[in-house]
């Protein structure tokens, strides 16, 4: 949502790093009392000299724990001996079992030097992580560790950012400190924290390094004066809790990461449909009109969304009684449900400090953040003066469940189908120190004035209820607590990370707030606020409907968020640069951070889109997993039906997306079961091809579909890279033999997007599209067989009831094609009336021996299509010769 109010606040420059090289001045540590077991190593680490106390007090006694957790995963943890220093709570990110591995069998090996202490992680004879270049620093408010890297490394990850997918390696700093970041600027910290990087070394494999630490940090990637490459961690606290994992390919490494942070949550079938939203729908009549207009334009609309416009003076858990009265809003939701469509609204964390149910209940239960003197902590957001829920409070889940149960009650409230949570970094418009939130709200017109009330809809909407037609009248630290050391400066730490907003507390919750429950400081847990709201919100949605998969889309995330929620990429703007960077962002979240329900605001959120940009973005957005058009109140309306070319582009885009929806659903389900990514950079499938390592403008949609969008305005061609393999044009069926070079694809109309099927694939598609996913599930299937260079192909299909958390029966099919024969086998538990009605074999120069009504040959597409009537009830085999 637009953050224009931030412009009213005084600007605070980004913090500047210290000028001296601390690692050379500090003594480091020496390892003693070293004990090695079958799958572990422990040691005491003692400060090796005079403390340097550069950005805090050097801790004299540390512990080292090394665990060979699996054959592909190594855990290395350096922490304080008294275990007072804050560690990420297991309630936020549960730890994986570390007892199954063996040092002898592990692909990763841990080596160390005792004095001064340093360590290396090796894979075979190759060094993956080497801290010998500088001394370990472990201070009360500053941790530093540096590792050497190979020359010109292929590094990825360290989100959230809008920089290149393959990270820069000279004078580059990634700052992790979640913030409200309008326009998602480059080279800054954004909404989420994902402290994991992947190092891809071509044919030697890929490894990942995850630092389980939620404190603010700078991660620097640079070269020394003599040209040696390094990566350096600079954190404001916490411990060094590393997970190293390795794989033969990038995909394998991503799978290993999922085992650490949790497998993604499965989503309902309908969530992959098209979604529409806008900040600025003035009333329920306008929302209804948008729904009606999509239907009239014959553009499928699965889910209608409403931003904070529906609220009474922007207060959560309220309705504007004049513009979104309960009775009319319930009528709209009923209309949507009767037409197999859905409805979603936004909920922010900040609760208005005023007489309303959310605030009154929260005060009664004491679940809001408090200052250290026990008074209510207040900020200023859209409704004006606000209080913030304390997600660590022992009663917070009950409070959140109760608010959802009352406001979103199916019989008496707003019966939403999914949830959108925003502003949960947490955002605070009032700059630090926010000593007068009341005055700030008054001076900045918070809440903003609502639009004039319309007594009825100004135009008729045939099919909608009468109400939508025109009216005739018009805790403190103790030893072993792991909650944080005492006597720290929680507002202005000695080391300042490069937070774009300036001081740590600026435009967010004060970092000296102490949470209820265990007594964690906001200083340590700031980056967890959004992900904890996500977990509580998912639980509250599930409490409403225990049997169905809850869709929750969040702005702020932390490592492991995908196990609970999806993510939209925040407040982008309507520019080609944001269109392009959305690809890299999507790939990082889906493949590297294990948050596969992902997408950006199609056509752009801020500013005014153009017809060409929106038409191109409609085609690209159809290949996000989360596909939503959304923009802000000061921009021109940009629903797809507003321009003829955009409407045509959207119809084409959704037609292909919906026909592919079961292919999407199948691959998405696989990721939730194994961690195998669905959306992938090119180098995930061609890990030995160096030309793919920095390609961030093409991507694979599953293993079978290569998408090569036009990425600049006024262009009708794209230079697309095709690895050494065979591909088939989605539209024409023409075979394209890739040679590891660029191919110019021309004459690409603004309503089109280049799509190619990778050889060796079998893709199940629906025989035709539909206006809703409910109707889509009634359509039959076709199989497209795209033989690989060896003449074989394979694919899969997963079906279930599309909604339930616990599935009573599933259909899991495997397709194989070899020597002219198609075989179908698998698990046939889920019953469906639809059949496989046709099989199309690409890459054929002559018709099949079959003739008549059974088979047909298309010489233009070089494809043979055979009509079938295969029930999905048991194994089958077809001769395609």
Curated annotation (Swiss-Prot):
Biased composition, Pro residues: where in the chain? 448-463
**UniProt KW Glycoprotein keyword:** yes
Mind listing the GO molecular function terms for this protein?
A: alpha-1,4-glucosidase activity; beta-glucosidase activity; carbohydrate binding
Could you confirm whether the keyword Ligase appears in this record?
A: no
Q: Which residues are glycosylated?
A: 171, 293, 373, 506, 572, 608, 742
Q: Which GO terms describe its biological process?
A: cell wall organization; polysaccharide catabolic process
Q: Which InterPro entries match?
A: Gal_mutarotase_sf_dom, Glyco_hydro_31_AS, Glyco_hydro_31_C, Glyco_hydro_31_N_dom, Glyco_hydro_31_TIM, Glyco_hydro_b, Glycoside_hydrolase_SF
One cellular component (GO) term of this entry: extracellular region
Catalytic reaction list: Hydrolysis of terminal, non-reducing (1->4)-linked alpha-D-glucose residues with release of alpha-D-glucose; Hydrolysis of terminal, non-reducing beta-D-glucosyl residues with release of beta-D-glucose
Q: Where is the signal peptide?
A: 1-14
- EC number in record: 3.2.1.20, 3.2.1.21
* Active site, UniProt feature: 422 (nucleophile), 425, 571 (proton donor)
- Looking at the record, which segments are called Disordered? 440-485
Q: What is its main location?
A: secreted
Entry's family note:
Belongs to the glycosyl hydrolase 31 family.
Name it: Probable alpha/beta-glucosidase agdC
Gene that specifies this protein: agdC
């Amino acid at each position: 949502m637009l953050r224009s109010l931030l412009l009213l606040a005084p600007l605070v420059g980004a913090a500047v790093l210290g000028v001296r090289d601390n690692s050379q001045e500090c003594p480091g540590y020496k390892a003693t009392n070293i004990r090695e077991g079958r799958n572990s190593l422990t040691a005491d680490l003692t400060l090796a000299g005079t403390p340097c106390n550069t950005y805090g007090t050097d801790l004299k006694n540390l512990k080292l724990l090394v665990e060979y957790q699996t054959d592909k995963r190594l855990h290395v943890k350096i922490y304080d001996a008294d275990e007072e220093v804050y560690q990420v709570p297991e309630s936020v990110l549960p730890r994986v079992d570390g007892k199954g591995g063996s040092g002898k069998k592990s692909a990763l090996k841990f080596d160390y030097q005792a004095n001064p202490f340093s360590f290396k992680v090796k894979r075979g004879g190759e060094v993956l992580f080497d801290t010998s270049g500088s001394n370990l620093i472990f201070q009360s408010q500053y941790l530093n560790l540096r590792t050497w890297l190979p020359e010109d490394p292929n590094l990825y990850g360290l989100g959230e950012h809008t920089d290149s997918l393959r990270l820069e390696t000279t004078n580059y700093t990634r700052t992790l400190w979640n913030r409200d970041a309008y326009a998602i600027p480059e080279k800054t910290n954004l909404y989420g924290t994902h402290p994991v990087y992947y190092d891809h070394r071509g044919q030697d494999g890929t490894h990942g390094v995850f630092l389980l630490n939620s404190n603010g940090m700078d991660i620097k990637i640079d070269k020394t004066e003599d040209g040696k490459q390094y990566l350096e961690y600079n954190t404001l606290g916490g411990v060094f809790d590393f997970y190293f994992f390795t794989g033969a390919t990038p995909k394998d490494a991503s799978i290993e990461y999922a085992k650490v942070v949790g497998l993604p949550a499965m989503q309902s079938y309908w969530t992959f449909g098209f979604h529409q939203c806008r900040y600025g729908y003035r009333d329920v009549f306008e929302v209804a009109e948008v729904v009606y207009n999509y239907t009239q334009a014959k553009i499928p609309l699965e889910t209608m969304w409403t931003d904070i416009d529906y609220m009474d003076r922007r207060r959560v858990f309220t309705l504007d009684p004049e513009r979104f009265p309960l009775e009319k809003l319930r009528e709209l939701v009923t209309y949507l449900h009767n037409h197999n469509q859905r409805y979603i609204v936004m909920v922010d964390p900040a609760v208005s400090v005023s007489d309303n149910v959310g605030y009154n209940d929260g005060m009664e239960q004491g679940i809001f953040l408090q200052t250290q003197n026990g008074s209510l902590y207040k900020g200023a957001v859209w409704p004006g003066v606000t209080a913030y829920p304390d997600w660590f409070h022992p009663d917070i889940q009950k409070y959140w469940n109760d608010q959802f149960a009352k406001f979103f009650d199916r019989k008496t409230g707003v019966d939403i189908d999914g949830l959108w949570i925003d502003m949960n970094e947490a955002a605070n418009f009032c700059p630090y120190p926010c000593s007068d939130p009341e005055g700030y709200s008054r001076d900045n017109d918070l809440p903003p004035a609502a639009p004039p009330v319309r007594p009825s809809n100004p135009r008729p909407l045939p099919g909608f209820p009468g109400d939508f037609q025109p009216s005739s009248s018009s805790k403190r630290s103790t030893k072993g607590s792991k909650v944080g050391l005492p006597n720290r400066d929680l507002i202005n730490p000695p080391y300042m990370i490069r937070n774009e907003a300036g001081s740590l507390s600026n435009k967010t919750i004060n970092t000296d707030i102490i949470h209820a429950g265990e007594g964690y400081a906001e200083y340590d847990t700031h980056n967890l606020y959004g992900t904890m709201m996500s977990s509580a919100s998912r639980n509250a949605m599930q409490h409403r409907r225990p049997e169905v998969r809850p869709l929750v889309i969040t702005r702020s995330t932390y490592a492991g968020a995908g196990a609970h929620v999806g993510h939209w990429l925040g407040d982008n703007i309507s520019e080609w640069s944001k269109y392009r960077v959305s690809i890299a962002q999507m790939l990082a979240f889906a493949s590297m951070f294990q948050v596969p329900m992902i997408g950006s605001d199609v056509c752009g959120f801020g500013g005014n889109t153009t017809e060409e940009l929106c038409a191109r973005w409609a085609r690209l957005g159809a290949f996000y997993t989360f596909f939503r058009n959304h923009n802000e109140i000061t921009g021109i309306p940009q629903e797809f039906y507003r321009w003829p070319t955009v409407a045509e582009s959207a119809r084409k885009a959704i037609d292909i997306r919906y026909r592919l929806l079961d292919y999407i659903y199948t691959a998405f389900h696989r990721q939730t079961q194994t961690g195998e990514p669905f959306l992938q950079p090119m180098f995930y499938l061609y890990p030995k091809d160096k030309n793919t390592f920095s390609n961030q403008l093409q991507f694979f949609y599953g293993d079978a579909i290569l998408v090569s969008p036009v990425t600049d305005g006024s262009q009708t061609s794209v230079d697309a890279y095709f690895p050494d393999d065979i591909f088939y044009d989605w539209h024409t069926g023409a075979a394209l033999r890739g040679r590891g070079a660029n191919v110019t694809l021309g004459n690409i109309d603004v309503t089109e997007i280049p799509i190619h099927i990778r050889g060796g694939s079998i893709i199940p598609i629906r025989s035709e599209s539909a206006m809703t996913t409910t109707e889509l599930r009634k359509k039959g299937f076709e199989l497209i067989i795209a033989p690989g260079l060896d003449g074989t192909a394979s694919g899969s299909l997963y079906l279930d009831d599309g909604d339930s958390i616990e599935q009573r029966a599933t259909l899991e099919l495997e397709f194989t094609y070899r020597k002219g024969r198609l075989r179908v086998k698998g698990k046939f538990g889920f019953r469906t009336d639809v059949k496989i009605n046709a099989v199309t074999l690409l890459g054929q120069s002559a018709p099949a021996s079959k003739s008549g009504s059974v088979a047909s040959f298309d010489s233009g597409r070089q494809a043979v299509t055979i009509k079938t009537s295969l029930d999905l009830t048991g194994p089958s085999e077809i001769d395609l010769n």
